[in-house]
């Protein structure tokens, strides 16, 4: 399907994706969660760089599976898609038996703080057992590196800002955050005990085209475009460090390259700025072109008051520099949602 391939190559040039030294010759990679929001963007970047790719995704019903199917539209015929759950060890073992992977990008997870409070067992099964299955498979099949998508939620109610990788993490406040912190610890163990080179990346509120429909920017944009009321939890003073998806993908690729220099690292990948919920709503209003009717609801359990990434380490070691400011990114996202008619 040459048209799809050329489309991937065009996106790679447009976004400026670069794979540094692992781009010297084509490699084979596994991307778990590759049909999701971040995973599909990463998969396009890897294919555009000429790599062989297998995507492992269970296409679960956390949101409409048709969204994930559409995320992969440009990759049909370019990648192998394995439909399966990472918590099913038989699926993982079969995938690794049939392929010889140079590296694994592990983005598959049950996502979201609030749903994890309602169903912690599901989150532990997928995010912990699933991660362990993958690490074991890497160990036994000679995989060179493992990039793990962690989360800023591991910082919990840390009052020191910006958050640094060297900060003491006293306690997490949601099952989701606990599973991500456990994943980091498992990666550390496998790097130390078995020589698997692991990079753990703490993502800070990623947004952009294809983002999940349950995320705030998606919900606000959909509501405004459809003339519906916006639900705002709390007084709007909570603040987040929003990171555009293209910047996250660049950071992931740079971290994969860094496995040639270090066996284990933790990196913050964020926008290095904070935006309050009220400011965010105002930006979406401006991008859409009209004001919102807001319904205030109580604060939600498990939500932290503020996130803010210190990206000094990623800048120094990875050459990571977020390029898309929040106002520009919101405009891009609203334009995409309008053109996609996802309201």
Locations of regions flagged by a protein language model:
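N-terminal Rossmann-like NAD(P)+-binding domain of SDR-like oxidoreductases, especially those catalyzing
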Residues: 10-206, 256, 320
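C-terminal substrate-binding subdomain of Rossmann-fold SDR/epimerase-dehydratase oxidoreductases
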Residues: 21, 45-48, 84, 224-343
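A glycine/serine/threonine-rich, flexible loop-to-helix segment
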Residues: 161-162, 213-221
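Hydrophobic alpha-helix immediately C-terminal to the catalytic Tyr-X-X-X-Lys motif of short-chain
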Residues: 182, 186, 190, 220, ...
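Residue-level recognition of oxygen-bearing side chains
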Residues: 91, 122, 129, 168, ...
């Amino acid at each position: 399907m040459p048209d799809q391939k050329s489309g991937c190559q065009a996106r790679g040039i447009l976004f400026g994706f670069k794979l540094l030294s692992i781009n010297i010759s084509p490699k084979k990679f596994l991307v778990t969660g590759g049909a999701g929001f971040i995973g599909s963007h990463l998969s396009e970047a890897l294919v555009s760089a000429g790599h062989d790719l297998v995507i492992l995704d269970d296409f679960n019903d956390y949101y409409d599976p048709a969204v994930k199917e559409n995320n992969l539209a440009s990759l049909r015929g370019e990648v192998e898609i394995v439909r399966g759950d990472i918590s099913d060890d038989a699926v993982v073992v079969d995938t690794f038996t049939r392929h010889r992977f140079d590296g694994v990008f592990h983005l598959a997870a049950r996502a979201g703080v609030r749903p994890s409070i309602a169903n912690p067992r599901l989150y532990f099964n997928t995010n912990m057992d699933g991660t362990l299955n993958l690490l074991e498979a890497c160990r036994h099949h000679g995989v060179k590196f493992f990039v793990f998508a962690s989360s800023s939620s591991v910082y919990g109610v840390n009052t020191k800002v910006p958050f640094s990788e060297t900060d003491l993490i006293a306690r997490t406040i949601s099952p989701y955050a606990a599973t991500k912190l456990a994943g980091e610890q498992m990666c550390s163990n496998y790097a130390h005990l078995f020589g698997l080179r692991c990079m753990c990346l703490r993502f800070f509120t990623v947004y952009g085209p294809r983002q999940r429909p349950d995320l705030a920017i998606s919900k606000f944009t959909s509501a405004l475009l459809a003339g519906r009321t916006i639900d705002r939890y709390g007084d709007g003073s909570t603040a987040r460090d929003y990171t555009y998806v293209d910047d996250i993908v660049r950071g992931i690729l740079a971290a994969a390259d860094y496995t040639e220099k270090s066996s284990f690292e933790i990196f913050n990948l964020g926008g290095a700025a904070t935006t309050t919920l009220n400011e965010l709503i105002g930006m979406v209003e401006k991008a859409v072109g009209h004001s919102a009717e807001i319904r205030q609801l109580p604060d939600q359990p498990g939500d932290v008051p503020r996130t803010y990434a210190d990206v000094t380490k990623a800048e120094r070691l990875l050459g990571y520099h977020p390029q898309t400011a929040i106002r520009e990114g919101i405009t891009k996202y609203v334009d995409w949602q309008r053109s996609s008619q996802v309201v």
